[in-house]
Curated annotation (Swiss-Prot):
The gene is rplI. GO terms for cellular component: ribonucleoprotein complex; ribosome. Pfam families: Ribosomal_L9_C, Ribosomal_L9_N. InterPro entries: Ribosomal_bL9, Ribosomal_bL9/RNase_H1_N, Ribosomal_bL9_bac/chp, Ribosomal_bL9_C, Ribosomal_bL9_C_sf, Ribosomal_bL9_N, Ribosomal_bL9_N_sf. The keyword Cytoplasm does not apply. This is Large ribosomal subunit protein bL9. Keywords: Ribonucleoprotein, Ribosomal protein, RNA-binding, rRNA-binding. Transmembrane segments: none annotated. GO terms for biological process: translation. Binds to the 23S rRNA. Belongs to the bacterial ribosomal protein bL9 family. One of its GO terms (molecular function) is rRNA binding. The lineage of its organism: Bacteria, Pseudomonadati, Pseudomonadota, Betaproteobacteria, Nitrosomonadales.
Length: 151
C-alpha cells in the first residue's frame, strides 16, 4: 500500500515521503495513529497544500523535545529498593519505577520513552539509562540504585 508519511517514522522515512508498506502495517498501525495517510491523488494534493504548516508543527515538537532533553541530560536519579548484603536487589528497578521517580521530580515522561540497555536493574549502583523524547532526541541520565537493608 502506498502511503504519505505525516511525521518522521523510524526506519521508514521523513515527513511527506511517499512509501510502500505492507497493508496490515498501514491499516493497523500507521494510519490509526495519524502517522500516515493513503497516497491517493487527492491526499497528495491536500498534503502539499498543508506541507509548510505540518513542517512547522514538527519543528515545534522537535524544539520542545530538545528543551526537555537539555533539562534531563546528565540528571542523577536516585531510586531506593530493598537489597541483600551482596548488593543484589530483592526484585528489580523497572522503567515504571524510573517513570515514577522522574514524575516526582517534575518531569513528564512515559514508560515507553525509557530505554534500559541491560534490561531492568537488579544490582545496587549507578546505571546509565536513555530517555527517548523524540525520534531524533534522546537524553542520557544516571539512575543510582540505593540498597535499603532488610531487618
Amino acid at each position: 500500500m502506498q502511503i504519505i508519511l505525516m511525521e518522521k517514522v523510524v526506519n521508514l522515512g521523513q515527513l511527506g515521503d511517499v512509501v510502500k508498506v505492507k497493508n496490515g502495517y498501514a491499516r493497523n498501525f500507521l494510519i490509526p495513529q495519524g502517522k500516515a495517510k493513503r497516497a491517493t491523488q487527492a491526499a497528495v494534493a491536500e498534503f502539499e497544500s498543508k506541507r509548510a504548516e505540518l513542517e512547522k508543527t514538527q519543528a515545534d515538537i522537535l524544539a520542545a523535545a530538545q528543551a526537555r532533553a537539555a533539562k534531563l541530560e546528565g540528571l542523577m536519579l536516585q531510586v531506593t529498593q530493598k537489597a541483600g548484603v551482596d548488593g543484589k536487589l530483592f526484585g528489580s528497578v523497572t522503567n515504571a519505577d524510573i517513570e515514577d521517580a522522574l514524575k516526582a521530580q517534575g518531569f513528564e515522561v512515559e514508560r515507553s520513552m525509557i530505554r534500559m540497555p541491560q534490561g531492568s536493574l537488579k544490582q545496587v549502583g549507578d546505571h546509565p539509562v536513555t530517555i527517548v523524547l523524540h525520534t531524533d532526541v534522546a537524553a542520557h541520565i544516571i539512575v543510582s540504585v540505593l540498597g535499603e537493608s532488610v531487618s
